[in-house]
A protein has these predicted regions:
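A short, structured beta-strand/loop element
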Residues: 31-60
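Short, charged low-complexity linear motifs
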Residues: 26-33, 82-83
Length: 102
């Protein structure tokens, strides 16, 4: 991952995200990384129906699917988990660069 993205995770404890190929044609998908209070990192892929995003509708937990979720111990393990989820770690950035909806 890029240094600025690594710094976002470690210094500001901010979320990072990247678009990924959705498993369903009528869904959009992202991988996001969330720093946890424990010092670990949650790496998750989510898929959301396109119509909810395109129509700017509110959606909830039940509207999303999570084809991948993993907790990793350190920032050094994030790249591997992100690859497992189907994304190149170099594409990770602040959520607004990938239109991450959460």
């Amino acid at each position: 991952m890029k240094i600025k993205v690594r710094n976002r995770l470690l210094m500001t404890k901010g979320v990072i995200a990247a678009r990924r190929e959705a498993g369903q044609a009528d869904h959009y998908s992202w991988v996001w990384v969330l720093p946890l209070r424990s010092g670990e990192f949650r790496v998750a892929a989510i898929e959301v129906p396109k119509d909810l995003i395109d129509n700017d509708e509110c959606f909830f937990e039940d509207d999303m699917t999570r084809p991948y979720v993993k907790i990793v111990d350190s920032v050094d393990d994030v790249d591997h988990a992100v690859r497992e989820a189907g994304v190149d770690p170099e594409t990770l950035d602040a959520p607004w660069y990938s239109d991450f909806p959460l």
